């Protein structure tokens, strides 16, 4: 697992952590939205690459961003979730069964399939991220506490 490709991808992860923390954390689109550029690592990871290396590198990437931003693991969970679901979504988009899928290459995807894969992964990532970021226990149990919290 620790071959030349893994070391190269580890440098990519370190570069993405630095880019996210130094540049993209200080960019605000329309005063509210912040770009999460690090998601491109999972989207563009090679299809035939080691799946366990993808999970490990996604953990390192998410943990690095969580450590610097002090966000308590929400980026790690979100990134690991899309890294785990990536191949299942890709199989769903391409319509390949398990035997054909192992020989399938991501370079064979059409532009629409790439766009669909990218959008789905980003939406899933953001759903996990924003639900975990805004989760409050007081909103679970009573509607009075939720009303007080929302006022």
Feature roles, as predicted:
Residues 10-11, 55-56, 76-77, 115-116:
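Hydrophobic alpha-helical transmembrane segments
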Residues 1-48, 52:
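Hydrophobic transmembrane alpha-helices
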